């Protein structure tokens, strides 16, 4: 059986990347929350 996680940097960035986050209101909220928390890494 094929495993469910077949990593692809492009796919990952398109869904979870910075530009993907900034494209929606809720995504911007995520970035804001992560900045407030002091995360070193904001997005994937």
From Swiss-Prot:
Pfam assignment, any one: Ribosomal_L34
Family as reported in the entry's similarity comment: Belongs to the bacterial ribosomal protein bL34 family.
Keyword field: Ribonucleoprotein, Ribosomal protein
Gene: rpmH
Classification via PROSITE patterns: RIBOSOMAL_L34
Protein name stated in the entry: Large ribosomal subunit protein bL34
GO biological process, one term: translation
GO CC, alphabetical: ribonucleoprotein complex; ribosome
Organism of this sequence: Mesoplasma florum (strain ATCC 33453 / NBRC 100688 / NCTC 11704 / L1) (Acholeplasma florum)
One GO MF term: structural constituent of ribosome
Keyword Lipid biosynthesis: no
């Amino acid at each position: 059986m094929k495993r469910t996680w077949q990593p692809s940097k492009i796919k990952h960035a398109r869904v979870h990347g910075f530009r993907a986050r900034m494209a929606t209101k809720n995504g911007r909220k995520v970035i804001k929350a992560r900045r407030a928390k002091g995360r070193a890494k904001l997005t994937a």
